Amino acid sequence: MTALFQQLPSVDKILKTSQGSQLITEFGHTAVVAICRELLTQARQFIKKNNQLPEYFSNFDRTFVEIHSRLQKQNQVQIKAVHNLTGTVLHTNLGRALWSEAAQQAALSVMQKNVSLEYDLDEGKRSHRDNYISELLCKLTGAEAACIVNNNAAAVLLMLATFAQGKEVIISRGELIEIGGAFRIPDIMEQAGCHLVEVGTTNRTHLKDYRNAITENTAFLMKVHSSNYQICGFTSSVSEEELAELGREMNVPVVTDLGSGALIDLSQYGLPKESTVQEKVAQGVGLVSFSGDKLLGGVQAGIIVGKKEWIEQLQAHPLKRALRCDKVILAGLEATLRLYLNPEKLTEKLPTLYLLTQPLKQLKINAMRLKERLESRLNSQFDIQIEASQAQIGSGSQPMERIPSVAVTIAEKTNVKLSALSARFKQLSQPIIGRMENGKIWLDLRSLAAIETLLNTLDEL
């Protein structure tokens, strides 16, 4: 075994070779030394366990191939672009909404230049970073003011911490949600230092339940969008409009966590109807929070709109600074919101809406092209068909609703397993992510952003 250890080259010997010099030129001295040390440590462990040299130390050429491979892998960006063929348009694990061209350009511009982020060009003095977007949001929603934080969970936390610390928040039992990542409304309330008061039952809550729970220690009445589930059957709930009327009568504010945050009526495009922010503001809700990267179709942000005096208190809370957005996010959000000033062009300009409204005819054309390319690359190893599919919006938006779609399905017909093909898909330069269902791989075209790029990627198979 000692002889095997002696066959291992030193780091210095590796670096002094011509190949070592080339590696240093390409990747830098520090990175090359670190990988060499890592490789030698692993080789010693391998010798102790197997009483032989690892393959990559059988000769110098193999050693340098291994070092080069590891250095390349180390330099690869780990957050990679993928082809979304899951049929879930707003897929949380795949980054949710695609940014519009306008948002991308706005973000790139502020990355490269100094900008008037907190500077009033008219007055020549400091301003607030939310001002530009606040004016735009007020115009779009009818609210008096707005506040921007880094996601909707942060928006809920800020509202609770500002108005309900040490006080009671009344909420229906049927709205005590948990979404992905074990985010629970009761946990957020606990973190904010407020007391949860549950009213009604899981399936039925009435206005009298809220009324009877109000005390002098009530901070506000809260409604929460049910997000990723739906209670059906023998149910009853109280609308924001009814709750707002009760709030005015009892002098208690009403707050809504709307979640998805639609700014337009989706039913005009034949999609499932979702409550809009404008509707909640018009119904008299004091504060409405929602996400920027769901139905809004933009950047990850938490947006709060509502009454000016309450928004001013949110802006003044110490948590606001900890939760604020940077210039890139704010620029992307502003550019996205400006698209809504011309709603007739939204299906062309906003990727999320474009994907959701693609006609089935176009999806079938894309499916035929995808099927042909797969058949040419997979050489009859699988049964490849075009089938009707059911896509979904995703990210908690209309969880029970489905959108007609078209998919290319792949089933086994030889001894080559689907699991092996799925693994190959994920090893491509731009991995292909579909879904497994009924013993087939489903590649749903509804959620695909670029058919040409996908076809080019498949040439790597």
Curated annotation (Swiss-Prot):
Gene3D superfamilies listed in its UniProt record: 3.90.1150.180, Type I PLP-dependent aspartate aminotransferase-like (Major domain) (3.40.640.10)
Keywords from the named record: Cytoplasm, Protein biosynthesis, Pyridoxal phosphate, Selenium, Transferase
Domain of life: Bacteria
GO cellular component: cytoplasm
Enzyme Commission no: 2.9.1.1
Pfam families xref list: Se-cys_synth_N (PF12390), SelA (PF03841)
Pathway: Aminoacyl-tRNA biosynthesis; selenocysteinyl-tRNA(Sec) biosynthesis; selenocysteinyl-tRNA(Sec) from L-seryl-tRNA(Sec) (bacterial route): step 1/1
Reaction(s) catalysed by this chain's protein: L-seryl-tRNA(Sec) + selenophosphate + H(+) = L-selenocysteinyl-tRNA(Sec) + phosphate
Similarity comment: family membership: Belongs to the SelA family.
Function recorded in the entry: Converts seryl-tRNA(Sec) to selenocysteinyl-tRNA(Sec) required for selenoprotein biosynthesis.
Name the record gives this protein: L-seryl-tRNA(Sec) selenium transferase
Native species: Haemophilus influenzae (strain PittEE)
Lineage: Bacteria, Pseudomonadati, Pseudomonadota, Gammaproteobacteria, Pasteurellales
Name of the gene: selA
